Amino acid sequence: MTMVGLIWAQATSGVIGRGGDIPWRLPEDQAHFREITMGHTIVMGRRTWDSLPAKVRPLPGRRNVVLSRQADFMASGAEVVGSLEEALTSPETWVIGGGQVYALALPYATRCEVTEVDIGLPREAGDALAPVLDETWRGETGEWRFSRSGLRYRLYSYHRS
């Protein structure tokens, strides 16, 4: 059976993206993301794929799978699938965004790795928002740390059976 995990960074307001981009830079979160996902399958939506810089697309060291409703969509270096179930064929799969793909994958997930960024970013119309975890999830919260970028952040690890 496939272990499905979700991984994201969010502002304290729950915003994960604005205008097709991540509105902060946190090198420590990028390193954490790389450590968690390296060697595994990563699943993302088309907009997340498009938001990756061309020089790192596909993300190296991982099987990149793009979920798209467009049957003719091409993603050089990645597999394109039409359903989440088609993507869940590896022993460990990490969903990396965006908001719609997180919502589809949440019922399958048993792990969530979350970076909370302490940044004043009120919600606006059109923002991509983090999934809401219900009472079936149990988590461990890390201490607040300071990034080299000057932002404060902390890591959460959530699990459910």
Curated annotation (Swiss-Prot):
Family annotation (SUPFAM superfamilies): Dihydrofolate reductase-like (SSF53597)
Enzymatic reactions: (6S)-5,6,7,8-tetrahydrofolate + NADP(+) = 7,8-dihydrofolate + NADPH + H(+)
Annotated EC: 1.5.1.3
GO molecular function term, any single one: NADP+ binding
Pathway per the UniProt entry: Cofactor biosynthesis; tetrahydrofolate biosynthesis; 5,6,7,8-tetrahydrofolate from 7,8-dihydrofolate: step 1/1
Keywords: NADP, One-carbon metabolism, Oxidoreductase
Domain DHFR: 1-160
Positions of NADP(+) binding: 8-9, 16-21, 45-48, 67-70, 82, 96-101
Matching CDD domains: DHFR
Pfam families according to UniProt: DHFR_1
Taxonomic superkingdom: Bacteria
Keyword Transferase: no
Metal-binding in keyword set: no
Binding site for substrate: I7, W8, A9, D29, R34, R62, Y102, T115
Similarity annotation: Belongs to the dihydrofolate reductase family.
The protein, known as: Dihydrofolate reductase
